[in-house]
Swiss-Prot record:
InterPro entries reported in the protein's UniProt record: DUF1328
UniProt feature coiled coil, ranges: none
Membrane spanning stretches: 5-25, 30-50
Domain of life: Bacteria
Source organism phylogeny: Bacteria, Pseudomonadati, Pseudomonadota, Betaproteobacteria, Burkholderiales
Keyword Cell membrane: yes
Entry's localization field: Cell membrane
Protein name as catalogued: UPF0391 membrane protein Bcep18194_C7021
Family: Belongs to the UPF0391 family.
UniProt membrane topology term: Multi-pass membrane protein
């Protein structure tokens, strides 16, 4: 349990560095691009799963 607390604390520190620095806008753009890529991958795998039945 303590291990997870330390991991989430480190993630929070990294997020704070990006959020309070000037990098937030660039990271948001990258996140948007990755979101759409993963939505497309999800839809493709969903369709492949339906077709294989």
């Amino acid at each position: 349990m303590l291990r997870y607390a330390v991991i989430f604390f480190i993630i929070a520190i990294v997020a704070a560095v990006f959020g309070f620095g000037g990098i937030a806008a660039g990271a948001a753009e990258i996140a948007k691009i990755l979101f759409y890529i993963f939505v497309v991958i999800f839809l493709v795998t969903l369709l492949l799963g339906v077709v294989r039945r």
